[in-house]
Structures are given as structure tokens and as C-alpha cells.
């Protein structure tokens, strides 16, 4: 059984809702899952998991949230080489540039993206919920 961490930061609850759907998808596929906020996770926990789903909404000028999530993620970057990961997040404006930039960073760090990233415009709709569950299953 694989062990998955679903790590997220959420300001309005949209990315948190996505995180819970990712966890459900991974559990349904047989994985053991821990759902953690960015402040509960760090580089020291990376080795305890077979795969990690990272979730963060677009903030400011299409950037990762910079007070909790981005510092935690930066600390984890050294452990991304060969690690199976997936990315998800919500946004209220723009076209997903923050996600494309984030994916490129992860690839440069040597991470293995298990599936396409999932984006939701504001609250996740039925399609985004299904995509989040599929993302979780892809990590399991």
C-alpha cells in the first residue's frame, strides 16, 4: 500500500475542498493518505511518503501563496528528485500561468509528475472534483 501526503494551503476553502477530493481518490485506489496543511509539512517529512500532492491557489500576480506555502515548498524542492508528485489549485483570475510556472519548477527539480495538474476556477465544479479524485488515484 502506498502512502500519500496531500499538502495544501487554502485562503477561501476552495483548495482545501480540492485537497479532500484528492485524498478521497487516493483512498479509493487503496492508498494510505494524510491530509496536511502547508504549516504541518516540510522537507523532513518528504521521505515518509511514496508520493505527494501539493495544492495551492494562485495569489497576487499568479504566484504561489508566499507566507506559508511557498517557503515550505522551497524547503521540499531538494527532495523532489525522482519523487512522484501531482499539483492542484484554484484561481479567480488569469489563465493558470502560476500552475505552468510551478510545473516547470517541479520538472527542473527532477520530480515525476504523475498526471496533469488540476485547476479550478473558484470553487471546484463537478469536473474539477472528478479530476481531483483522478489525481489522487494516479498517485496511489
Regions found by a protein language model. Name each.
Residues 8-12:
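Aromatic-flanked redox-active Cys/Sec active sites in thiol-based oxidoreductases
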Residues 2-4, 14-17, 21-38, 42-44, ...:
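FMN-binding flavodoxin-like domain, especially the glycine-rich phosphate-binding loop
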Amino acid at each position: 500500500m502506498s502512502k500519500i501526503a496531500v499538502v495544501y494551503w487554502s485562503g477561501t476553502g476552495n483548495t482545501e475542498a480540492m485537497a479532500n477530493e484528492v485524498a478521497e481518490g487516493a483512498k479509493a485506489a487503496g492508498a494510505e493518505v494524510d491530509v496536511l496543511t502547508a504549516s504541518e509539512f516540510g522537507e523532513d517529512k518528504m521521505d515518509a511518503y511514496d508520493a505527494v500532492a501539493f495544492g495551492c491557489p494562485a495569489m497576487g500576480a499568479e504566484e504561489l501563496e508566499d507566507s506559508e506555502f511557498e517557503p515550505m515548498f522551497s524547503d521540499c524542492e531538494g527532495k523532489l528528485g525522482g519523487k512522484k508528485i501531482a499539483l492542484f489549485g484554484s484561481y479567480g483570475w488569469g489563465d493558470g500561468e502560476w500552475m505552468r510556472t510551478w510545473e516547470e519548477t517541479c520538472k527542473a527539480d527532477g520530480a515525476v509528475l504523475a498526471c496533469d495538474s488540476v485547476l479550478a476556477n473558484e470553487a471546484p465544479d463537478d469536473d474539477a472534483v472528478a479530476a481531483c479524485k483522478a489525481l489522487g488515484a494516479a498517485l496511489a
